[in-house]
């Protein structure tokens, strides 16, 4: 069975239960959450995450493993503002604690960081420093470094940069990788015509065993654009065929696949989630040209 799901919302009083219910309504077999808003530091205490009820619902619906995404505000690549770096370190420690408390997530996806003008090498060294401050030998969750598109001053735009970070970290057995299809395509890798070649390259440079999460997104931009703008499955420059191949790749069957595709609709206040129909389409093997209209009609 393919492990596939999407980003879902953990909110209200139900929290983890709400996230699981939303995922199940999409026909998902895994899902990804933020433990609070991705753009700020406000967090409900662990006791209010409704973990027990959420886990029970997951168990009843055959969901064994979920993914946590660290908030965007963490930037341990920042060399110019010590307070930004320190916030990132402290907050990442807290996210590890919160993710461990969930008991059903083994991976926290992290955007490695941005060097904010100091240069990639300086940024990478700072990320290594931050991860060395955060990681402990007895933690039960991994930090999954996300492959980035190369927008602005992002670090992690190539497999070599990801490998350099991993190699510099003391407890690097606690590091894994989240392979984002849109980001990797936008960074210049030909996942459309030669995904197997790209995967082999990843294996040589980073090691395929570290690939523990997949973000499945189409891209609004051509390969190598360095933009990072997600598109709905089959409606971008990667296309349905390539994404279906990746989702069902025999070397990646155990890896959770998470959709982060955009909501659909002209009215900003009434956009519809695409995940139920996109998951269905990726499972059944046939591209549906009328998908966006069907999503709007939900």
From Swiss-Prot:
Binds 3 Zn(2+) ions. Zn(2+) 2 binds at residues 146, 180, 215, 260. It catalyses: Endonucleolytic cleavage to 5'-phosphooligonucleotide end-products. Zn(2+) 3 binds at residues 183, 228, 230. GO terms for molecular function: deoxyribonuclease IV (phage-T4-induced) activity; DNA binding; DNA-(apurinic or apyrimidinic site) endonuclease activity; phosphoric diester hydrolase activity; zinc ion binding. Its cofactor is Zn(2+). InterPro entries: AP_endonuc_2, AP_endonuc_F2_Zn_BS, Xyl_isomerase-like_sf, Xyl_isomerase-like_TIM-brl. Keywords: DNA damage, DNA repair, Endonuclease, Hydrolase, Metal-binding, Nuclease, Zinc. GO terms for biological process: base-excision repair. It comes from the Bacteria. Its EC number is 3.1.21.2. It holds the Pfam family AP_endonuc_2. Zn(2+) 1 binds at residues 69, 111, 146. Endonuclease IV plays a role in DNA repair. It cleaves phosphodiester bonds at apurinic or apyrimidinic (AP) sites, generating a 3'-hydroxyl group and a 5'-terminal sugar phosphate. Belongs to the AP endonuclease 2 family. This is Probable endonuclease 4. The gene is nfo.
């Amino acid at each position: 069975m393919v492990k596939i799901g999407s980003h879902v919302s953990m909110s209200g009083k139900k929290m983890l239960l709400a996230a699981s219910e939303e995922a199940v309504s999409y026909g998902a077999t895994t899902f990804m959450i933020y433990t609070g808003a991705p753009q700020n530091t406000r967090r409900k205490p662990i006791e209010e995450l409704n973990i027990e009820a959420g886990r029970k619902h997951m168990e009843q619906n055959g969901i064994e493993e979920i993914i946590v995404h660290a908030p965007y505000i963490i930037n341990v690549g920042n060399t110019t503002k010590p307070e930004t770096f320190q916030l990132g370190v402290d907050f990442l420690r807290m996210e590890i604690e919160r993710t461990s408390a969930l008991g059903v997530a083994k991976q926290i996806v992290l955007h490695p960081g941005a060097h904010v003008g100091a240069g990639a090498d300086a940024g990478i060294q700072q990320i290594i420093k931050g991860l060395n401050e955060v990681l402990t030998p007895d933690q039960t969750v991994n930090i999954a470094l996300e492959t980035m598109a190369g927008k602005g001053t992002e670090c992690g735009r190539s497999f070599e940069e990801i490998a350099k970070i991993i190699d510099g970290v003391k407890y690097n057995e606690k590091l894994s990788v989240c392979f984002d299809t849109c980001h990797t395509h936008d960074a210049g890798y030909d996942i459309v015509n030669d995904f197997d070649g790209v995967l082999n390259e990843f294996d040589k440079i980073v090691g395929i065993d570290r690939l523990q999460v997949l973000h499945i997104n189409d891209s609004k931009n051509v390969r190598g654009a360095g933009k990072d703008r997600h598109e709905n499955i089959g409606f971008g420059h990667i296309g349905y065929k390539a994404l279906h191949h990746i989702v069902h790749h025999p070397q990646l069957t155990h890896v959770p696949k998470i959709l982060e595709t955009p909501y659909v609709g002209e009215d900003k206040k009434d956009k519809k989630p695409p995940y139920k129909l996109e998951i269905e389409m990726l499972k059944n093997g046939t591209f549906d040209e009328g998908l966006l209209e069907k999503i709007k009609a939900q």
